[in-house]
């Protein structure tokens, strides 16, 4: 296709709290699966006392299967200095019961005048300002196959690779 259907980008938030923290995002059509997740990958300590280990992650699952997962390295019981990844999971439907569907929530918010679910005009205008700059300087398209996670060169964007998402995660 000659139409842009995939984007992978590295972003930064320009304030003191998030200074120096890279934010990576990718989205596209006909990828391996549809997943709405935000993954926070914590820095590893300067020294790994228990050998090579996975990074600790905090995962927010959005959409049909809302929840929060924390994946962390925990020392195994006993005298040996061994760790393994342990996952702690909260399934929102289990904890809080089933909720309204997305369209039902949106229509209800519009009816009762709840502005929380709607984008403010200043955010829309700022988004268009960014998009206009991108459209003025088109970039080379990188094709990818349907059912993959995007073009190969998108993998190089994230130094240690993209965090596993969706069915890639052992739950």
Region locations from a protein language model:
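Secretory/organelle targeting and membrane-embedding segments
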Residues: 1-171
């Amino acid at each position: 296709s000659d139409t842009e259907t995939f984007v992978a980008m590295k972003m930064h938030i320009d304030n003191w709290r998030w200074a120096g923290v890279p934010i990576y995002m990718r989205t596209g059509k006909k990828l391996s699966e549809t997943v709405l997740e935000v993954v926070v990958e914590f820095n590893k300590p300067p020294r790994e006392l228990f050998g090579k280990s996975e990074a600790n992650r905090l995962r927010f699952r959005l959409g049909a299967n809302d929840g929060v997962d924390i994946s962390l390295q925990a020392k195994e019981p006993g005298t040996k200095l061994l760790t393994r990844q342990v996952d702690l999971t909260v399934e929102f439907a289990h904890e809080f019961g089933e909720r309204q569907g997305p369209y039902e929530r949106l229509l209800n918010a519009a009816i009762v005048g709840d502005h929380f679910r709607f984008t403010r005009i200043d955010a829309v205008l700022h988004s268009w300002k960014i998009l206009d700059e991108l459209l003025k300087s088109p970039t080379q398209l990188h094709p990818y196959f349907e059912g993959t996670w995007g073009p190969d060169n998108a993998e190089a964007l994230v130094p240690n690779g993209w965090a596993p998402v969706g069915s890639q995660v052992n739950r």
